[in-house]
């Protein structure tokens, strides 16, 4: 994992208005992705989920998939991230026909940067979504461990307001 010169490691929870740390991670195909490159094509909805192939994470990820046309209409991109391996992300993608990148943050470095890595919990990261504008500032932070649809639904609401 790498971060750029104006993104320093920050273990505090990232908040609305903060500059989102840039990073480089491999996706489910083994291709390297950076936040800054993805932002060239529009806002990014970056959602952290605890573990691929689990019931709640599958529901959340599939809801993001099912709303693909709405995200596309707003010129935004969806980007999932967990501490699973590239192979596990590939399996999760194939099993659920996901149409967006899933990043493998195996060591939890990016989760630490965004302040969502748990220290002693079975769930490795806090289920959190960051809506990031093209200027790399966080437009909104969405938290919910119980309502899986909230993440995609609220992200769309934020993106609509940004576009208005």
Name these PLM-found stretches.
Residues 1-164:
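Chalcogenol-based redox active-site neighborhoods
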């Amino acid at each position: 994992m790498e971060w750029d010169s104006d993104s320093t490691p920050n273990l505090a929870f990232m908040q609305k208005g903060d500059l989102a740390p840039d990073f480089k991670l491999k996706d489910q195909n083994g291709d390297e992705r950076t936040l800054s490159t993805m932002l060239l094509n529009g806002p990014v909805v970056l959602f952290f989920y605890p573990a691929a192939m689990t019931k709640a994470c599958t529901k959340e990820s599939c809801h993001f998939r099912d709303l693909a046309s709405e995200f596309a209409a707003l010129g935004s991109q969806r980007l999932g991230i967990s501490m699973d391996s590239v192979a596990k992300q590939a399996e999760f993608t194939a099993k659920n026909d996901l149409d967006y990148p899933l990043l493998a943050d195996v060591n939890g470095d990016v989760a630490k940067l965004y302040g969502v890595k748990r220290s002693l919990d079975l769930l490795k990261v806090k289920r959190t979504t960051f809506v990031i504008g093209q200027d790399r500032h966080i437009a909104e932070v969405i938290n919910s461990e119980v309502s899986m649809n909230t993440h995609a639904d609220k992200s769309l609401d934020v993106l609509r307001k940004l576009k208005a």
